[in-house]
Amino acid sequence: MFDLVTVDAVDSVALAAFWATSCGLTEVEREDDGRWIVLAEPATGLRRLGIQRIGGLLPAQAAWAGDRKARIHLDLRCGVGEIDAEVARLVSLGASVVRSSRDETYGRIVTLADPEGNLFDLCAYG
């Protein structure tokens, strides 16, 4: 069982703010210089997401080309009737749509990138 998922960032403070607002998480840990920030679900302290500041080109920025995907990404869940509104909310927070809404056998999916280019899918299962 994993403890948390870590996302690499050039601006860890800004990216942590994006993910905290996007997923309803709160900051539970931060190194003084902001190099390492941990977010978690407020009620339980679970669903931990680490944001780690690095330098240079991020793997997700280098990995996406045409139909190739980054090797790992997050899946966020929303209700079937909520996907368009949720995409609009995420875009207003700084995300960008990488691949438009599409139907898969397990539900409707939209691929987005966070403000630093890390890919994630918004999934409406059902």
Q: What function would you assign to each model-found segment?
A:
Residues 32-36, 104-108:
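Short acidic/glycine-enriched loop/turn segments that link adjacent beta-strands
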